[in-house]
Amino acid sequence: MEFDHLLVRYGELTLKGTNRKKFVNALKDNVIKSLQTIEGTHVKGKRDRMYISLTEEADAQEVINRLTKIFGIKSISPVHKTSQELDEIKKLCVDLAQDFKPGETFKIDVKRVDKSFPMDTYALQRELGGAILQATEDISVDVKQPDYNVRVEVRMDGVYVFTQIYEGAGGLPVGTGGKTLLMLSGGIDSPVAGMEIMKRGVYIEAIHFHSPPFTSEKAKDKVIELTRILSERVGPIKLHIVPFTELQKQINKVVHPRYTMTSTRRMMLRVADIVLEKVGANAIVNGENLGQVASQTLKSMYAINDVTSTPILRPLVSLDKEDIVKKAREIGTFDVSIQPYEDCCTIFTPKNPVTEPDFDKVIKYESVFNFDEMVQRAADNIETLTINKDYKSEKDQNTDALIDELF
């Protein structure tokens, strides 16, 4: 039986108090943006839930697929709407039951939001259950483990009936928690960190450090693709690509080999701080995981963080690597992240990097050269791309154009 509405249940935003309206409006805006390319949809946001009406032109399954990726949504149900007339409600439930197979079981769950409705909850359950039993054969009631749970919600504007629930992404609507700058390396961890922070309602812009010719265009393409995957959930994301070769070569000239990783990370943060101020972000996000590599011990983090007063958010800091890999697979970034193209964090890696850097030595090595101008130059020569879910590089566009000419 074809449905004509989608019921969207809110996630954590239901815990908000006087500012709930702000969160509901932000979620509504995000839903409208996500569905704008699909014909036949109309979004109506209310305080406790959202309804999306569908016409025959709407691709209902595609609408559901997009909604499940939007942060702030707990779940989605395809629903059928009718009036508060008892006969109409019975007819709708009986029509739904025609999809039940012989031997299957059901139960009726009634939620009577409109307390002015003349029948109480249990009486309505009995009426509807009886109507289904009378109109079908070899179908029975099981209130504990039914094959179908027929949910009926009686509201002021009508009665909604449904049997399916699709799990949403949860979290808070993106845009309600400010903006951060995600340090996107191209590995497994940083895209997951970006997804986790977006789930808290935070909008991201991404920054990537590119060191040609030591890092290839394939490494850059990989980061673009990771950004594209992240954008599927939130819309267009700006990716800032930093020319990092000059800085990285100079670090390797003047800093002791065991300390080059520490200094590299410090210079990255210095550049990121400049970009953060330009774009109006409030924090830096990275995929660091405590103890995973030499630069991610507590002493290393302390030495690296010294160059900035900006808050640094580490959503993955306490997770096991297996948990991070699992999340990467779930969000669709894992297969891209493991492509064998080196980024600037893996080139020039010392054989024996220091895990507990002496802070005084870090300062001593870096004082041999004034990095200020080089840091500013890197920040001034950034390439900024706006990536959405349909993004194609100039190379891909040229390829498409060539194919069109040939065929």
Swiss-Prot record:
SMART domains xrefs: THUMP
InterPro entries: Rossmann-like_a/b/a_fold (IPR014729), ThiI_AANH (IPR020536), ThiI_fer (IPR054173), ThiI_N (IPR049961), THUMP_dom (IPR004114), THUMP_ThiI (IPR049962), tRNA_STrfase (IPR003720), tRNA_sulfurtransferase_ThiI (IPR050102)
GO cellular component: cytosol
This enzyme's EC code(s): 2.8.1.4
Keyword Nucleotide-binding in record: yes
Pathway assignment: Cofactor biosynthesis; thiamine diphosphate biosynthesis
Protein keywords: ATP-binding, Cytoplasm, Nucleotide-binding, RNA-binding, Thiamine biosynthesis, Transferase, tRNA-binding
Record flagged with keyword Nucleotide-binding: yes
Residues engaged in binding ATP: 183-184, 208-209, 265, 287, 296
Subcellular location: Cytoplasm
Domain THUMP: residue ranges: 61-165
Gene Ontology molecular functions: ATP binding; CCA tRNA nucleotidyltransferase activity; tRNA binding; tRNA-uracil-4 sulfurtransferase activity
Catalytic activity of the protein: [ThiI sulfur-carrier protein]-S-sulfanyl-L-cysteine + a uridine in tRNA + 2 reduced [2Fe-2S]-[ferredoxin] + ATP + H(+) = [ThiI sulfur-carrier protein]-L-cysteine + a 4-thiouridine in tRNA + 2 oxidized [2Fe-2S]-[ferredoxin] + AMP + diphosphate; [ThiS sulfur-carrier protein]-C-terminal Gly-Gly-AMP + S-sulfanyl-L-cysteinyl-[cysteine desulfurase] + AH2 = [ThiS sulfur-carrier protein]-C-terminal-Gly-aminoethanethioate + L-cysteinyl-[cysteine desulfurase] + A + AMP + 2 H(+)
Enzyme class: transferase
An example Gene Ontology biological process: thiamine diphosphate biosynthetic process
Domain of life: Bacteria
Known role: Catalyzes the ATP-dependent transfer of a sulfur to tRNA to produce 4-thiouridine in position 8 of tRNAs, which functions as a near-UV photosensor. Also catalyzes the transfer of sulfur to the sulfur carrier protein ThiS, forming ThiS-thiocarboxylate. This is a step in the synthesis of thiazole, in the thiamine biosynthesis pathway. The sulfur is donated as persulfide by IscS.
Entry's family note: Belongs to the ThiI family.
UniProt cross-references to NCBIfam families, sorted A to Z: tRNA uracil 4-sulfurtransferase ThiI
Protein name: Probable tRNA sulfurtransferase
